[in-house]
Structure formats: structure tokens, C-alpha cells
């Protein structure tokens, strides 16, 4: 009986978001109790890998953020490739609206953040933190509404998140890269022809790709570019189809194999390692510092304004039309859910303010903005979709 209940839970579309939320809540509770010492020891525990004279030594926190999150970005890359080649993003007309919405949803939060910090140039580097959307949380919240949610709304939200991920990848590569090591970068670059050759020769075994991918990840890690980007690049070379057997898709097979590991292992572990905010001794200044306030306002206000403004502009100019089965109220609900930045915002925040002084904690703003956006989006869509159901039932009665 218990096993059936566990299986039923993991079959829920919302289960990934629920596990992620529980991991974050657990981290916050532990960080504010006597267990905080254990928590700090866990995330700062030294972990080293040594092969001969070569070694990589980092603490657990960095291994999670640089290593395990590379697997997450690898999965994101696989999803991007599939969607662009055969999915929702394969048609130019289909991608204009979510692409525009994602662009607006990245620009406006950054503007809001910079408005809050315009007198503090040293904090400007946090501008990209509220530009992100956490698709696991957003879809988890959306799935709580059950089968009332039209498929077009799910596709719209997922498409925005995909373009959001593309934007985040570009931002990390361009703005959060340290001093470059050209030698390491050259080694990473040398991996690309080998990956291309494997793809062109229709090598469908994943093992050689992963072996080269590990070498590329180490080189990128040493180069100064964030190591997670190696995961995205590797994903682009995984074959979508086996040319000798069109029914076999190595990419989709790998995507399926990684989904549960990422959703129920890597992302919750990342949330646990990054959301442990200790509020002991935190005063008014720390809680209402311009950085966390700017992030929270960027996620809640900037996201919805940016997404809605771009959608309105696209409709007004006749560039695209309203997706079938959707209306402006539903788009607004989706725009609110886009303000749930959690995972990617925490990730970018760790890059922007690594080793920052205790004047503020950017994670407070991420959590505040994400919670308010999630609740507001859920309430808006619950009311809107309920209205839609009621309208439908009235129409059916009228025509009977």
C-alpha cells in the first residue's frame, strides 16, 4: 500500500517541485537551529579527486554547483535540442510569442533591480539574478491546478522557460566568467571536433560522448568559464536519431534516464546546499538591503510587467496571435509564475556575490520574490481557470 502511494506521488507532475521545495525548507530550518554547525560542515566539507599528479580539490558546495549542476545543464541542453529540432520551438511562428515574453521577462527584472541599486555600483553585478525562471517550481505550481489547465498554457510556460534558460546560459558565459586560461580553453575546444566526429559517424553509444564530456568539463572548470556550460555544449552533439534505426532516439533515451536523477536528486541537493539562510542576528538592514529588495521586486514586479508588456506589443503589432484556448488572464497568471526564480536565481546569485560581505544575503530576495510570485500566480490561475470552467458549463446548458 505504502509503495503504491510512493509511486503515485512520483508520477504526479508536481512531485519534482514539491521535493525541491521540501529540500529548500529543510535547509532553512536546519540553518536556523542548533544543527546549523552540521549544515556548515556538510557544505564546506573538502572533497578531492586525484589521478597521479592531477587533482581537483573543492568543498562539497562547489562540487554540487560546478559538478552536479553541469548534469542539470546537460539535461537542459538535451531538452533545448529536441524542442528546436522536432518540438514546440521547431516552428518560427510558434516561438515568437514565448521568445518575446522571455526577453521582456529578463530585461524588465534587471531594470527593476538596477533601479533599487542605482547608487551602489558595486552591487550592479547582481542584475541577472531576478532574470531567471525555475521551470520545475513553476510547472509544479501549475500542475496543482489539475486538468483544468489547457495544454497551450503549459506549452507557453515551458517555452518561456526554455528561452529563459538560453538567456541564462548566455549571461553566465558573457558576464560571470573569471580570468580566462587560454591553455585550458584550447583543450576544451579540442574536444569539439571529436564530439562532432562521433555525431557524424552515427555513434549512438553514449559512453564515448560522456568520456570526452568529462575531459571538456575539467578543461572548462580550469579555464575560468563556468564549468556547467560544458554540459550544454556536450548536449548539442548527442544524436537525436539513430540513422540506421529512426525509431531509436539516443537523445530522448538519455533525457528520460536523467530526468528523475535531476528532478529528485541533483536539484533538491542543490536547493539544500544553497537555501540554508541563517536569520540569527539579522536586523532590518540585512533584511531590507537594496540587493534582496531589488531581487524580490525584480522577480515579482519586473517579471510580470516584462512578460505582459512584450505579449501585448507582439499582439498589437500583429506579429503573433493568442495561443488557442488561452486568454490574457491566463497569460498574466503564467507571467506571475515566471517570477519563481529559485534554482537558477540561486545559481546566478552564487556567481555574482561569491564570498560577499555579510551586509546582505541575496538569497532572501530570491526566496521572498519566488514565494510571492508563486502564490500570486497560483491564485490568479485558480480564479481564472475556475471562471473558464463555469463559463463552459453555462454555455453547455444554454445549448442543450
Swiss-Prot record:
Could you list this entry's UniProt keywords, alphabetically sorted. Antiport, Cell inner membrane, Cell membrane, Ion transport, Membrane, Sodium, Sodium transport, Transmembrane, Transmembrane helix, Transport
Pfam families hit by this protein: Na_H_antiport_1
Kindly indicate whether the keyword Transit peptide belongs to this entry.
Answer: no
Q: Which GO terms describe its molecular function?
A: sodium:proton antiporter activity
Q: Name one GO biological process term.
A: regulation of pH
* Protein's UniProt keywords contain Isomerase: no
Q: What is its main location?
A: membrane
Q: Where are the transmembrane segments?
A: 10-30, 60-80, 95-115, 126-146, 155-175, 178-198, 218-238, 265-285, 295-315, 334-354, 364-384
Reactions the enzyme catalyzes: Na(+)(in) + 2 H(+)(out) = Na(+)(out) + 2 H(+)(in)
Please report the record's description of how this protein sits within the membrane: Multi-pass membrane protein
The record's GO CC annotations read: plasma membrane
Kindly list the places in or outside the cell where this protein is found, as annotated in its UniProt entry: Cell inner membrane
Under InterPro entries, the record lists: Na/H_antiporter_dom_sf (IPR023171), NhaA (IPR004670)
Q: Which family does it belong to?
A: Belongs to the NhaA Na(+)/H(+) (TC 2.A.33) antiporter family.
Reported function: Na(+)/H(+) antiporter that extrudes sodium in exchange for external protons.
What's the protein name?
A: Na(+)/H(+) antiporter NhaA
